[in-house]
């Protein structure tokens, strides 16, 4: 239920911020900056910070609910740290996107949307390329899979399934959750298969490969 409520709630907050004049207030503060990119950054910061504060109760409730069901093992300080990291990463990406959009609108008022659409593909590919080596390690510790026999089996199975990956990693998710998971991430040389240590600790090789 909370998963389906989160997005409509966020859009409701955007609507309230817009109709109450809070957005104009942020715009007025940001317009005082000499450089446009700094103005964009200030506007995005205040908007993101306000959303962070308003969404915090719902996010905290989801965290406590997960703890009460024994799914999450994460301490509050660690959970809060992850949320702060989320904030700054989202802020940085948003500033970049907004700045590029404003520049495109200024340079081509009639076709800016077409150029923006054309940039979404390379930008998405870039994010997919850097995520396993830049973004993900900020949250957790990744290391090459220690069980080389299992790694060989996984790579053989991946080859049969046409999954282009030559690397298998494990990540210390047991510090945060009891859930099991494995996934493929990245593209090109950064493509990799990742197994949570909870999966490695609780399942046999045959169960993992299944």
Give residue spans per PLM region.
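Polar-ligand-bearing catalytic/cofactor-coordination segments
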Residues: 1-210
């Amino acid at each position: 239920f909370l998963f389906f409520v989160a997005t409509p709630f966020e859009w409701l907050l955007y609507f309230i911020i817009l109709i109450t004049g809070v957005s104009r207030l942020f715009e007025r503060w940001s317009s005082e900056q000499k450089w446009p990119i700094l103005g964009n950054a200030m506007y995005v910061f205040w908007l993101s910070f306000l959303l962070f504060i308003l969404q915090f109760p719902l996010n905290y409730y989801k965290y406590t609910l997960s703890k009460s069901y024994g799914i999450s093992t994460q301490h509050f300080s660690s959970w809060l740290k992850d949320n702060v990291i989320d904030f700054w990463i989202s802020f940085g990406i948003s500033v970049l996107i907004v700045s590029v959009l404003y520049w495109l609108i200024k340079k081509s008022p009639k076709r800016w949307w077409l150029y923006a659409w054309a940039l979404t593909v390379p930008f998405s590919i870039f994010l997919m390329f850097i995520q396993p080596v830049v973004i993900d390690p900020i949250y957790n510790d990744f290391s090459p899979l220690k069980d080389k026999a299992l790694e060989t089996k996984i790579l053989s199975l991946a080859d049969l399934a046409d999954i282009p990956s030559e690397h298998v990693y494990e990540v210390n998710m047991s510090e945060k959750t009891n859930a099991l998971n494995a996934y493929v991430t990245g593209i090109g040389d950064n493509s990799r298969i990742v197994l949570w240590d909870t999966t490695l600790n609780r399942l046999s090789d045959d169960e993992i490969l299944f």
